């Protein structure tokens, strides 16, 4: 566990809250100080649900530190009286875990009628993803019982959960495809599942677990313990979805169910057209212009692999780089992306990812909320394809990432992300139609003010010498620049107003790359201030 102000994963008890908030008649009680109840606020803010989060904080105050569990039995009794859950999950937060208290004894003293499970979510060993996956697997192991197989072919869907990335939409997409195939659903978990539903998991003919982050271990356990085969692929993209459907039919056939393949039009929203417009879109002149735009992809394991392959295989975009913050899935990501990238970036430090993006300057960044901030800093196009996310990625409309519908959604995101901003480009080219009049009025005129020629003095200190002064003339027809002496250490160049004005005339979609090239030129030649003449010199030398 380490302290950071931006993290890709939440704390361990945040992962516990995701499972409890996903299930019916299950409640989480956090043994935590007042400050650790922020988890409740996160779920209330982001989850598009009219229900209160299924979690309660048993507050440990400063005066309780020596006997912090004294309030826990009363809190558990209050939760049982108010909520009437089938199961209460008790967990210490990342702060109270330091007290090393025996929560089992405190829970027993409460004398509850419902079942109580004390879960050891040690933040020094796990974060959100591992905590959620481990808890869900433990629940499946605890409650799943041998069952007779359902009469008709049915499947379990494991993985959709509270605060999952487009999880509700992905579930709708999976339901649509299964209904088209004539396959019924036995249990969806943890989303909307009860303890009784977990008991029925072994009755299914097949388990579908599309996410590497949640549901994978539970699906593997059901296969090993009860012989329920598992389909662990994520149908992201048109071709992967076709392969996913074929694999599903094969596994059900091995279990004794012959599932006929309906016409592809049956998978479309109207039942008449192609299930996805991506193959057609990829052949149009619009998408032809994207074939040379490099993309950088970063996020969780499932979406990084799926989106990277989709961009490369189906939209024809070169992949400048890819990576994941889910370290325990790094080997799987490397295996899946062999041939797509030379090296997979594996890190949970956003500064490292930001530095890679700054070095690559790709035309499109596919990442998390953090990469959205980084891209904004460098004026790069960005679309969010993975958690962590902000509220704008918890949408009301149907926006899946899985299946044929998901392929159309991702293609739309790529297209609109890369082309939106034309208005900005037109304003740069033809003026702002008076939008900057108030700013110009500060100079005493509403008309455009031409910058007067000026001389800029650049000081480049040398060791054990008086600073050398180089004077650069801005006016003049030729971009002659007096080369200053090389500095002892690399300078961090500052943009002069005339250079910034000239940079704004560069089309926005390559402006970030031009800025980076010019700054690199300035460092190499020791220019502390980037003037218009320095910019022109860099353009001549580098083709910036």
UniProtKB/Swiss-Prot annotation:
SUPFAM superfamilies: Helical backbone' metal receptor. The active site is at 286 (proton donor). The keyword Nucleotide-binding applies. GO terms for biological process: light-independent bacteriochlorophyll biosynthetic process; photosynthesis, dark reaction. [4Fe-4S] cluster binds at residue 36. Pathway: Porphyrin-containing compound metabolism; bacteriochlorophyll biosynthesis (light-independent). InterPro entries: ChlB/BchB/BchZ, LI-POR_suB-like_C, Nase/OxRdtase_comp1, P-CP_red_C, Protochl_reductB, Protochlorophyllide_Rdtase. Keywords: 4Fe-4S, ATP-binding, Bacteriochlorophyll biosynthesis, Chlorophyll biosynthesis, Iron, Iron-sulfur, Metal-binding, Nucleotide-binding, Oxidoreductase, Photosynthesis. Its EC number is 1.3.7.7. Substrate binds at residues 421-422. It catalyses: chlorophyllide a + oxidized 2[4Fe-4S]-[ferredoxin] + 2 ADP + 2 phosphate = protochlorophyllide a + reduced 2[4Fe-4S]-[ferredoxin] + 2 ATP + 2 H2O. Its cofactor is [4Fe-4S] cluster. Binds 1 [4Fe-4S] cluster per heterodimer. The cluster is bound at the heterodimer interface by residues from both subunits. GO terms for molecular function: 4 iron, 4 sulfur cluster binding; ATP binding; metal ion binding; oxidoreductase activity, acting on iron-sulfur proteins as donors; oxidoreductase activity, acting on the CH-CH group of donors, iron-sulfur protein as acceptor. Belongs to the ChlB/BchB/BchZ family. Protochlorophyllide reductase is composed of three subunits; BchL, BchN and BchB. Forms a heterotetramer of two BchB and two BchN subunits. Component of the dark-operative protochlorophyllide reductase (DPOR) that uses Mg-ATP and reduced ferredoxin to reduce ring D of protochlorophyllide (Pchlide) to form chlorophyllide a (Chlide). This reaction is light-independent. The NB-protein (BchN-BchB) is the catalytic component of the complex. This is Light-independent protochlorophyllide reductase subunit B.
